[in-house]
Amino acid sequence: MKIGIIGAMEQEVAILKAAISDITEVNKGGCTFFSGQLNGVDVVLLQSGIGKVAAAVGTSILLSEYQPDVVLNTGSAGGFDSTLNLGDVVISTEVRHHDADVTAFGYEIGQMAGQPAAFKADDKLMAVAEQALAQMEDKHAVRGLICTGDAFVCTAERQEFIRKHFPSVVAVEMEASAIAQACHQFQVPFVVVRAISDVADKESPMSFEEFLPLAAQSSSEMVIKMVALLK
């Protein structure tokens, strides 16, 4: 078993990087790959950079050159579900682009030409995420649709657009749909496990900066437990 783990920012991968033994570092395509062992399992940790293009580039290199059996996407997200608070966890059931629109050609809003409308997370990986969550005392989690776009969602207008077109959305962020699409095209199972750094309708940019470390801690803890369960 080899596990690919993807985070966008240095802050989102730092805890995981510190937990990897016999680590080696490779820089390629503007991305950084850390290989080694985590809980006795072979892992490749990708720090992709922010946004969908950076994530797609990094994930494609990860999948083609390192050939992981599964991919876990970690990091922070903005909460849309009313029950979510800072530091809570979201587990993807599916992932969609919220900033794609080729409806003029008969596709659904958020669906790219030639691609499914939604990228479904792997059932087994979702179950492992649930098992990991059960090991985390008093940690609240929501399962559902995660939406991705190349924008930090902090305006009422954009929030309203996303809620209108994706009413079941539980969280938004800036990389997961690109990662999911790459995994779909390479036929590699994936799941997204992120923690909430800011909540819609609140002071999102301010809370993001303040609570990113909390989100990184929560999501990294989940991933470490998942890796142990996948051993």
Swiss-Prot record:
It catalyses: S-adenosyl-L-homocysteine + H2O = S-(5-deoxy-D-ribos-5-yl)-L-homocysteine + adenine; S-methyl-5'-thioadenosine + H2O = 5-(methylsulfanyl)-D-ribose + adenine; 5'-deoxyadenosine + H2O = 5-deoxy-D-ribose + adenine. Its EC number is 3.2.2.9. The keyword Repeat does not apply. Pathway: Amino-acid biosynthesis; L-methionine biosynthesis via salvage pathway; S-methyl-5-thio-alpha-D-ribose 1-phosphate from S-methyl-5'-thioadenosine (hydrolase route): step 1/2. Keywords: Amino-acid biosynthesis, Hydrolase, Methionine biosynthesis. Substrate binds at residues 78, 153, 174-175. Pfam families: PNP_UDP_1 (PF01048). GO terms for biological process: L-methionine salvage from methylthioadenosine; L-methionine salvage from S-adenosylmethionine; nucleoside catabolic process. It comes from the Bacteria. It is an enzyme of class 3 (hydrolase). InterPro entries: MTA_SAH_Nsdase, Nucleoside_phosphorylase_d, Nucleoside_phosphorylase_sf. GO terms for cellular component: cytosol. CDD domains: MTAN. Gene3D superfamilies: Nucleoside phosphorylase domain. The active site is at 12 (proton acceptor), 198 (proton donor). GO terms for molecular function: adenosylhomocysteine nucleosidase activity; methylthioadenosine nucleosidase activity. Belongs to the PNP/UDP phosphorylase family. MtnN subfamily. Catalyzes the irreversible cleavage of the glycosidic bond in both 5'-methylthioadenosine (MTA) and S-adenosylhomocysteine (SAH/AdoHcy) to adenine and the corresponding thioribose, 5'-methylthioribose and S-ribosylhomocysteine, respectively. Also cleaves 5'-deoxyadenosine, a toxic by-product of radical S-adenosylmethionine (SAM) enzymes, into 5-deoxyribose and adenine. This is 5'-methylthioadenosine/S-adenosylhomocysteine nucleosidase. It comes from Vibrio atlanticus (strain LGP32).
